[in-house]
Amino acid sequence: MNYQIKRNTEETQLNISLANNGTQSHINTGVGFLDHMLTLFTFHSGLTLSIEATGDTYVDDHHITEDIGIVIGQLLLELIKTQQSFTRYGCSYVPMDEALARTVVDISGRPYFSFNSKLSAQKVGTFDTELVEEFFRALIINARLTVHIDLLRGGNTHHEIEAIFKSFARALKISLAQNEDGRIPSSKGVIE
């Protein structure tokens, strides 16, 4: 199934679709480093994203990065509500040379985000690295996930962020996988 949101504000104009079919993604955010990270995310999560985005990047990349996180989170929530049969929990460790990241995901319906990741530099190229946390916070809160992201080892900032995006993607893939009995994975019988 394909989920789509068009979101237009005074700061950004977004047209984003999400599918859980593993087909080729098309990502054009206007922010090269973010395009790269989202491409890695789609490859390692098995999700398909189509993103056409423009915005006030002449100010900085904050609005477009955060707004894309918001919309991807909203789309993930729709996918989760439709799917209903999923493993729920996922954990992934990903090394990227000297960097090592761990992400733990719970599709709980209770939004919580812990980001224990001290990045080595404030910028990768022109991209402000503090936006990594902003992107994930926006996505996770809007998808109603519980997520813990920990950067366990660091070094090169590009490697640190790449390990974070890949570990999140792989943990999400595990948590979205169909569960064996087809039931909602909660003793309450519901995840909202």
UniProtKB/Swiss-Prot annotation:
Catalytic activity: D-erythro-1-(imidazol-4-yl)glycerol 3-phosphate = 3-(imidazol-4-yl)-2-oxopropyl phosphate + H2O
Pfam families reported in the protein's UniProt record: IGPD
PROSITE patterns: IGP_DEHYDRATASE_1, IGP_DEHYDRATASE_2
Biological processes annotated in GO: L-histidine biosynthetic process
Record InterPro entries: IGPD_sf (IPR038494), ImidazoleglycerolP_deHydtase (IPR000807), ImidazoleglycerP_deHydtase_CS (IPR020565), Ribosomal_Su5_D2-typ_SF (IPR020568)
The organism's place on the tree of life at top rank: Bacteria
Any one Gene Ontology cellular component term annotated for this protein: cytoplasm
GO terms of molecular function: imidazoleglycerol-phosphate dehydratase activity
UniProt-listed CDD domains: IGPD
Keywords: Amino-acid biosynthesis, Cytoplasm, Histidine biosynthesis, Lyase
NCBIfam families: PRK00951.1-2 (NF002107), PRK00951.2-1 (NF002111), PRK00951.2-4 (NF002114)
Name under which the protein is recorded: Imidazoleglycerol-phosphate dehydratase
Native source organism of the sequence: Staphylococcus epidermidis (strain ATCC 35984 / DSM 28319 / BCRC 17069 / CCUG 31568 / BM 3577 / RP62A)
